[in-house]
Amino acid sequence: MLKKIQWVSSHEFEVKINALIDEICNKEEDKIALFVEREVLDDETVYSFNTEKPQRAFGNAFPPILSTIDKKIEIGSEGILNNIITRFQRLDSRKYYNYPSAEIMRSKRINKVIILTDTIGSGNQLNKYLNCFWNTPSIKSWLSSGHINVYVVCFAATEFGLSRVELNKTKPSVFYSRICPTIDNSFTNQERKKYMKSATNIIL
């Protein structure tokens, strides 16, 4: 089982993520909003919005959760991904916008929203994050009218997670470097039964 584990260096991780972003942002006129996926509350939205109709989003986007706020928390892939989007914005600040405000989304005519994450497992957390966009009235309107499209960039994903995320209401296009090795796709039926039996014996 240990032989099936795949080691990924931070350098390889960054190179692959950068390449996938470049693949999406292939038009000179593209205006890109960049976000890094994180845990969210059930009722969280990207922007505040007017409760009375017409509901209109306003103000700053919800913030990233930075590990540097609490030094007890180790900086992992989330820190790397935030560094990546910072570099893209510095590379071309007229094309890339990190966590843009609702006003910038309108004035700059953002047409692509890219959400970065390290891996897609079950797809639960990413789906909740995507729902924050769908539950923000102005963004929902832009998505429905085709003014913006959502893209998800990750290093690896399970086939199950991909199938769930692709059914999200935001209709995201998912770009990934590789499929995650799982017990189902890495072993034969006989091998799976053997490992499951061993695991059961250990638990007992």
Regions found by a protein language model. Give the residues of each.
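A short glycine-/small-residue-rich loop at the edge of a beta-strand within enzyme catalytic domains
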Residues: 120-121, 152
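Generic enzyme active-site microenvironment
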Residues: 115-116
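PRPP-dependent phosphoribosyltransferase catalytic core
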Residues: 1-79, 84, 131-204
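Short, glycine/charge-rich flexible loops or terminal/linker lids adjacent to PRPP-binding catalytic cores
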Residues: 60-111, 121-127
